[in-house]
Amino acid sequence: MASRARALADPTRLMLAAALREGGELCVCDLAWVAERAHNLVSHHLRSLRSAGLVTSRRDGKMVMYALTDQGEHLLASLLDARARLTA
């Protein structure tokens, strides 16, 4: 659990996870546009999220599609709920 939480401690990774929560399954190009980051940087962050078990990937032709795992959904929801309580 701690390693998964550390993976979302990075602001870019948190933004990517939130985008996947909103958009469902997205490709690197879509995530790079949302995060306003370079494709290679987004790919690096997605690898970290995948290693932590927070996202899955699948190949669709030349593109790789990413989605949150159930664990990723749960952890992100917990973090966002905690943040909302702190700012309320």
Language-model segment annotations:
Residues A19, V34, R58:
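Residues within the alpha-helical elements of helix-turn-helix
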Residues M1, R21-E22, A67-A88:
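Amphipathic alpha-helical dimerization/coiled-coil segments
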Residues R6-T12, T69-Q71:
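Short helix-coil-helix linker/hinge
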Residues P11, G23-C27:
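Short capping segments at the starts of secondary-structure elements
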Residues A17-R21, L49:
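Hydrophobic residues on short alpha-helical segments
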Residues L16, D30-A32:
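A short acidic, leucine-rich amphipathic alpha-helix
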Residues A38-L41:
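Helix-turn-helix DNA-binding motif, specifically the short coil turn and the N-cap/start of the second
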Residues D30, R50-D60, A67:
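Beta-hairpin "wing" of winged helix-turn-helix
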